[in-house]
């Protein structure tokens, strides 16, 4: 079967688990917007994980709350959907019920870290001094920005494929995974650019009522950095609106996330993003805006401030 998943830590964990329980012949790492826009053709021999549902797919696994709004017909697919800390946890739960859980038990430590990372149940220390699987989660997260830099020994897609086997061989030993030369060169860049990233966040961010607005449009070279650091810098805010240029400048991306330390926001972000054609969870989501993005951003911000 062909596995189609997201290019992040959760998508990677899904791939690791599915390799244990299904015959995976090929893997594609894709952007959720391409799936939403119908640019990815799927069929009965495909597995879709951590991505929006597409009619006709063989198996679908997801946990994004926005999919409840988007797809009311839950009888038309095979696989599993549930509100869970991660899509990898949904995959795990499905195969445990199918009697194949024994093959997946050795990934318990990895799964706990994926759950913690994807649901953003992190401590201040996890963000400022990450290590182990948590550090890997930030390195593999496209939002960290490491993939936009060049000069690596292998491409990011090649690294994702390599990581599946590397994790399978070392399910209880994240330090061995982190020591791999192709992983380590990305870790080194992550820490080298942390100061520049923090400075840029301060320069490009303002606070309106309860919301941080970080406008990164026009930034030619974005330093890599942890997207959660912003909440350590503005602890009084409970939500962030992050705006940046989309692929090839064809659209504007608006990413919204609850503060992981000041958890007082009343906005269901996934539902709000769905209204504009995006998606996500209650605590985080994004949307790609093509028509009059400025007005739509102000409308999104107004709702966030009104909700408190």
Label each PLM-derived region with a short phrase.
Residues 117-210:
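Hydrophobic, aromatic-enriched interface-forming segments
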